[in-house]
Structure formats: C-alpha cells, structure tokens
C-alpha cells in the first residue's frame, strides 16, 4: 500500500499546528493514510506533541516543493493531500506535469482560491494558477468555496470538507443562559492580518451604530505587526471614543480568546472571501451572530445549517442584532455540520477519496 502524504506547503504556524494536532488526536489511530506529513516551517516541538505522526520539516516553500516533486516523479502511484497550498512552485509542477492530476488532492483554505492581491507578480501568476487548478484530481472545501470554484472549474470533482476548528462540543449550550442587554460589544476581524480590512470595517460599524457600541479588534497575530496595529488604532480613535475602542495587540491563549468572544454581541467581518471560519464557529457556538460581506460565500454554508446571517449591506440596529441572537439560540448547535465532532465524517471520507480507497 502506498501511503497518502499530507503537505502543509507554507509556513503558517497556527494553522499547521491545528492540522497536525487534529490528525494526531482524531485520525491517525484509525487510518494509515493520516500519519505522513511534509511541512514547510520549523518543528518547534510539533513532533513531540504529535507522536502518532511522521513529520518531515523543510526550511521553506521551495525546498518542500522540490522534495514533493521528486517523490511524485519517482512514484506515480504516490498521492498527496495538499492542505491550503500557498506554494507557487507546486502549482507550476501540477501545470507542467511534474505532479499528475491523479496525485494531487487539495483542501481549499481560501487564499489560494481568490485573486485579491494587487502586486504585479501575483497578477502575472494568477492565470497560470487558474490553469493548474483545472488539473486538480479533487478539491475539498466549504459549500460556498465549492460553488465559487465550480464556476471556473466545473469539471473538477468537489467534496464538502471543513477546517478542523478547535472546539469543545460541551460548550454548544453555553449561550442559552446568558442575558444580553445594554451597550453592545462588536468584534471586528479575526486577526491582525490586513485581509481583515480593519479600517474599512471600523468605518462601516461606525456608520451603522455611531459611537454607541464598544468595538473589540483582536490583532495579536501575526507577530511583528506593530505599525499596522497603530494605524488601525489611530483610525479607530477618529471614529470611537477611547472607552469604546479596544485594540488587542497581544496574542491570546485559546481560553482567553473564548472568554473575549463570549463578551461580544456581534461579529463583524468585511472581507470578501472565505476566511476566519474558526472564529465564526466559536462565535456561533456562543450564540453570537455574524455580519458577513455578501461576496463571502461562507454565507451559503451558514444558511444550509439554518443559521441567521446578517450582511454588511443590511441596515443594522440593536433590535435586528437581538433578533438574530434569538434565532441563533433556537438552533440545535449539535447538528451543525462544520462544528466538532460533526466534521470528522467529512475528513474520514476525504482521506478515503485522496488515498484512492473509494471512487
């Protein structure tokens, strides 16, 4: 049996750690196709914390891509499951035949699907990547991303799959006994990454609610982001009084982040692509509705699960937010497909498809 190899092709420590720990804790014991990994980035204790996995680390995208291509050429029966991708050399290898379509299975994380970067080298690369994506053996993604991908690549097989958000199912009912009243608290963005368009989001929140709400902006990740954090803080202070603006520059531990989310009444996400599903899941679990850009296709997944969705183009006020909270409280969160442990079934099927065990 040729064992499936999983590839984390870009050095994104928090996502890579989440995926590795999920495979170690939830999949490796029951599937031989859930144990072999090639990862761009440093070990940083991951091998020790994931003893059920065999993980090979590479110093960067280029060295990892070269190793993957060599393995693909040496054994055309070898299959690879690419998580997130983010690696131009791998896309070019798929396009040129270095990696065959039958060897290439891709879990879409969002960024490699949408063409949002304005830099010249990205704009030149996008058409090549689009051509390469036509050659993927099978894509795995959210319902919204599958729909988006199918518009340009209708012949590529697509299967529903959700990123393994770290969640405690016992907390699914935690919002039911909470009373919400008084000044609303709104979470803006899911990290300090510029893709959150924090300043535009703060302006949109101010346009809807004025300086009558408290705004919390978590910006502790990525590191070395002080200049942008200060830019967001100053823009926020032009809109909101100091007591109503909380820009968090330190990375929060998971429990502290959960506590922060539970203090919010609304999540506000202005970005036009699917991202931040982890934060969305934790907010929904806590009974906190979310405002999405209508261009963000994840709204399709939310409506499929009978969850209320608010849009950035809606006229919002406190009554509308409280009604969305009421609707969310009536949903049985144990049935939501993208919650833990429900997404496990999708992962087991994805492994079987990528390994060639099921058609």
From Swiss-Prot:
Its EC number is 2.4.1.325. It holds the Pfam family Glyco_transf_56. It is an enzyme of class 2 (transferase). It catalyses: beta-D-ManNAcA-(1->4)-alpha-D-GlcNAc-di-trans,octa-cis-undecaprenyl diphosphate + dTDP-4-acetamido-4,6-dideoxy-alpha-D-galactose = alpha-D-FucNAc4-(1->4)-beta-D-ManNAcA-(1->4)-D-GlcNAc-undecaprenyl diphosphate + dTDP + H(+). GO terms for molecular function: 4-acetamido-4,6-dideoxy-D-galactose transferase activity; fucosyltransferase activity. Belongs to the glycosyltransferase 56 family. This is TDP-N-acetylfucosamine:lipid II N-acetylfucosaminyltransferase.
């Amino acid at each position: 049996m040729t064992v499936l190899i999983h590839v984390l092709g870009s050095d994104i420590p928090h996502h890579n750690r989440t995926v590795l720990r999920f495979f170690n804790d939830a999949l490796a014991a029951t599937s031989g196709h859930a144990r072999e990994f090639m990862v761009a980035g440093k070990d940083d204790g991951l091998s020790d914390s994931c003893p059920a996995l065999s993980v090979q680390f590479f110093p960067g995208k280029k060295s990892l891509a070269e190793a993957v291509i060599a393995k693909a050429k040496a054994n055309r029966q070898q299959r690879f499951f690419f998580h997130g991708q983010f690696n131009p050399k791998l896309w070019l290898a798929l396009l040129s035949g270095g990696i065959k379509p039958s060897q290439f299975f891709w879990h879409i994380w969002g960024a490699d699907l949408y063409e949002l970067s304005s830099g010249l080298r990205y704009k030149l690369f996008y058409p090549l990547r689009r051509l390469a994506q036509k050659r993927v053996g099978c894509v795995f993604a959210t319902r919204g991303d599958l729909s988006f991908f199918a518009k340009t690549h209708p012949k590529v097989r697509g299967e529903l799959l959700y990123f393994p958000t770290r969640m405690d199912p016992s907390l699914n009912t935690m919002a039911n006994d909470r009373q919400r009243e008084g000044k609303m608290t709104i979470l803006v963005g899911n990290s300090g990454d510029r893709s959150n368009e924090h300043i535009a989001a703060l302006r949109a929140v101010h346009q809807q609610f004025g300086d009558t709400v408290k705004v919390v902006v978590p910006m502790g990740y990525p590191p070395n982001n002080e200049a942008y954090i200060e830019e967001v803080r100053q823009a926020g202070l032009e809109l909101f009084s100091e007591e109503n603006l909380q820009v968090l520059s330190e990375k929060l531990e998971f429990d502290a982040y959960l506590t922060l989310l539970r203090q919010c009444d609304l999540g506000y996400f202005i970005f036009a692509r699917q991202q931040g599903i982890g934060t969305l899941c934790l907010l929904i679990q806590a009974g906190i509705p979310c405002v999405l850009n209508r261009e963000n296709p994840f709204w399709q997944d939310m409506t499929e699960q009978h969850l209320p969705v608010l849009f950035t183009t809606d006229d919002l006020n406190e009554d509308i937010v409280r009604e969305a909270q009421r609707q969310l409280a009536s949903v049985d969160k144990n049935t939501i497909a993208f919650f833990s442990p429900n997404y496990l079934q999708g992962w087991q099927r994805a492994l079987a498809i990528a390994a060639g065990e099921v058609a």
